[in-house]
């Protein structure tokens, strides 16, 4: 019986695998790439590394400097990316900014000087715009300089009061022309009312005299007198409304017809 030599014969007749040619740009491993990472173009630090993510082009690989914590691209310009560089690190950067400005030793010199200036300024140095405007108005008004002392002018309450008084004085001056016309009209109306009251008193007296002589006269004569008196009232009312004009002045009611 022949020995079993199938396994050996299979190994002898096995064909060798062909060797594949790998391009040179694929031969560089990640370790070799990390070793050959160039120095940082900003701080010249050799503490740099190759970025495995966010590399959009193999011809221009992206690197990161651990010293200044900035990214740059080989063959390109230096990118001014803040610490972390990603949107996921934004909350951390905000917290760092709050912590950084929470103490004076971590703040810039300009901010420290500004804060010190604001704190060192006395409270009385603040400018009150309302008081300045009131003082400006009082300086322009003619009535604001009367009956004032040095202590009253310094107080903001006094200056505000004078400003309101000057404003009301200007408004009254502007409306004097219109108020003059209305004043003359009111005077004329008042005179007309007084004349009407006087005329009504005379009519009442005439009627009382007629009723006194009622016992001496007949009913027919009394009726004629009453009819004549009432018929003359419209004419008298029209005549009492007539006015005499002498130049530009209005005279009172002409009551010569009534024996005044």
Swiss-Prot record:
Residue numbers spanned by region Disordered: 83-124
One term under GO cellular component: nucleus
Compositional bias annotation for Basic residues: 87-101
Residues the entry annotates as binding Zn(2+): 40, 43, 65, 68
Keywords: DNA-binding, Metal-binding, Nucleus, Transcription, Transcription regulation, Zinc, Zinc-finger
Cited function: Transcription factor that binds specifically to a 5'-AA[AG]G-3' consensus core sequence.
Name listed for the protein in its UniProt record: Dof zinc finger protein DOF1.2
Organism: Arabidopsis thaliana (Mouse-ear cress)
Gene: DOF1.2
